[in-house]
Amino acid sequence: LRLVTTTRSQNPISERWPDMREAGIGCLDAAAAVGRDPFKSAVRLWMEKTERHDLLQPVDPSLIQSAATAAYWDRLLEPIVAAHYALRTGRQVKRTRALLRHPQHPWMLALAGREVVGAPDVQLLECRCVGMDEAELWGAGLPDYVRIQMLHRLAVTGAKTIDVAALICGQDLRIHRVERDEVKISRLIDAEREFWHCVATDCAPLA
């Protein structure tokens, strides 16, 4: 795994990441930035990045750690998904707590996440927990918006391959592979650059 310019801090990355997200486009922002996220529009993402919180629906702070949210179960089950990926594939997985920034495109950010150690064919692992409301999108394979997110991560990290281990509805573990594609990454960077120009110039993207 070749890591590009890395930002580190003594503070836990989970505490710093909400602030850092406003300084660039993260992996989970990528599909929304290019208008391909079924759950978030480019306009909403722009409002978040430009801190137009008065235009966004308020989020109840008590729900952030609530067991009623998908994010809660994601955080809880991700280590289990990673462990079962290692068990099924026989590969060693190591978590890396580093925030990365692309050297040529400083607005492109990504968490290093999990690294697959000593495997010649894959370098990174992404773990997802897919609930009932999202499972249909995974019926035909890896959803397009997730593939875009993974291409963003490959672009920032410099890695060639990432496996996506997705636990569907708590009982069906599926593994999808995303290979580095320079043509698609170049197009993604161009589209993300246009979005970030909208953020930098405080001009909303087209709906």
Name each model feature, range by range:
Residues 23, 52, 91, 201-202:
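A generic structural signal for solvent-exposed, polar alpha-helical segments
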Residues 199-207:
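Residue patterns forming the tRNA-binding/recognition surfaces of aminoacyl-tRNA synthetases
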